[in-house]
Amino acid sequence: MEYKRPFGVKIDLETGVIPGAKRIVRKLSDMRGYFVDEEAYEKLLREDPVVYEVYAIEQEEREGDLNFATTVLYPGKVGKEFFFTKGHYHAKADRAEIYYALKGKGGMLLQTPEGEAEWIPMEPGTVVYVPPYWAHRTVNTGGEPFVFLAIYPADAGHDYGSIKEKGFSKIVIDEGGEVKIVDNPRWSV
């Protein structure tokens, strides 16, 4: 039998960068339809800021293997809504995931397909377990980049379409300097 070789990489804990990793950049223009305040979105779109970057170490999509990635989620807002990742279910919905906060301040918004939502605040050292069947999105509620590590099954896949179509049942906003979790006026089952 030929065994896969073990390896190690170093994560820059200050920047979140994994040297040599696959880099994905998500700009505001990649997130049309995700934010509630369309007028604020169009105004900020003129600058088209980078919302987040992902540095992924991916394996072959097969059962039993693991992928891992860091995400650098930048501070910012569209209207009152904090910058967030697109969010997704897993294509193989029965797959779980682990997130570990490295730097900054934010949280994880999770929901079931029926719209039951949970908010888990995150700061450096926080570990979040994402159970199977739960959609998940990270949100930067602070003033500096929010950096975290994600570890997930290599065959989990990503279902972004369900979130793009229906959104999350809750949104995370800045209400007078406080983080508030409120109903998404555009959400539908």
UniProtKB/Swiss-Prot annotation:
According to the UniProt record, one GO cellular component term is: cytoplasm
**What does the record give under GO molecular function?**
glucose-6-phosphate isomerase activity; iron ion binding
- Keywords per UniProt: Cytoplasm, Gluconeogenesis, Glycolysis, Iron, Isomerase, Metal-binding
How would you classify this enzyme at the top EC level?
isomerase
The record's annotation in Pfam families points to:
GPI (PF06560)
Q: Which residues form a coiled coil?
A: none
Q: Which residues bind Fe cation?
A: H88, H90, E97, H136
* InterPro entries, sorted: G6P_isomerase_archaea/bacteria (IPR016758), G6P_isomerase_prok (IPR010551), GPI/OXD (IPR051610), RmlC-like_jellyroll (IPR014710), RmlC_Cupin_sf (IPR011051)
Its BP terms in the Gene Ontology are: gluconeogenesis; glycolytic process
Q: Which reaction does it catalyse?
A: alpha-D-glucose 6-phosphate = beta-D-fructose 6-phosphate
EC number of this enzyme: 5.3.1.9
Q: Per its UniProt record, what SUPFAM superfamilies does this chain match? A: RmlC-like cupins (SSF51182)
Entry similarity comment: Belongs to the archaeal-type GPI family.
Q: Which named protein is this?
A: Glucose-6-phosphate isomerase
Originating species: Thermococcus gammatolerans (strain DSM 15229 / JCM 11827 / EJ3)
